[in-house]
Amino acid sequence: MEIKNKKVVVTGAASGIGKELCIAFKSHGAASICAVDVNLDGAQETAQQISGMSLFADVSKEEDIKNVIEKTTKEFGGIDIFCSNAGIGGLPGFFESETADWQKIWEINVQAHIHAAKHVLPQMLDRGEGYLVNTSSAAGLLTQLGASSYAVTKAAAVSF
């Protein structure tokens, strides 16, 4: 994948893998990078570090993802690479968890990928190029004791 002069969006960019992706894209010559996170202060810090743009988004909400795509498309003139990276873990174990716990992790770790695809792929298909990168985990391939909700969502992300 050629990075130089590409317009990039990364969700979950306030810390961890998302922040490091932004830094890596910048170091490989990306033209424009938008750091997206529910933690806007963290996204702004990342954006400052890479001379990029930052936006707030709760990726569990389709409307937030749609707005990010619309705003960055308008600002950058399109999106070449969309990294759907935001994710959560650390929820209660199977017997301790509630339906709301499962719904929350599903919306963030799976639905966010689906919403991103729905709203960013049309412009990429129209241009005949672009990359949608969905972050998952080895937990989606291996059983993890005490992490069933996380593992299930990561397996779904691998399959999507």
PLM features: residue spans?
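Canonical Rossmann dinucleotide-binding motif of NAD(H)/NADP(H)-dependent dehydrogenases/reductases
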Residues: 3-32
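Conserved glycine-rich Rossmann-like NAD(P)H-binding loop of the short-chain dehydrogenase/reductase
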Residues: 30-43
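The beta1-alpha1 cofactor-binding region of Rossmann-like NAD(H)/NADP(H)-dependent oxidoreductases
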Residues: 40-41, 57-67, 99
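Substrate-binding pocket helix/loop in short-chain dehydrogenase/reductase
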Residues: 93-106
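Active-site loop immediately N-terminal to the catalytic Tyr-X3-Lys motif
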Residues: 95, 142-148
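Active-site helix of classical SDR
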Residues: 117, 153
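Residue(s) in the substrate-gating loop at a strand-loop-helix junction
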Residues: 137
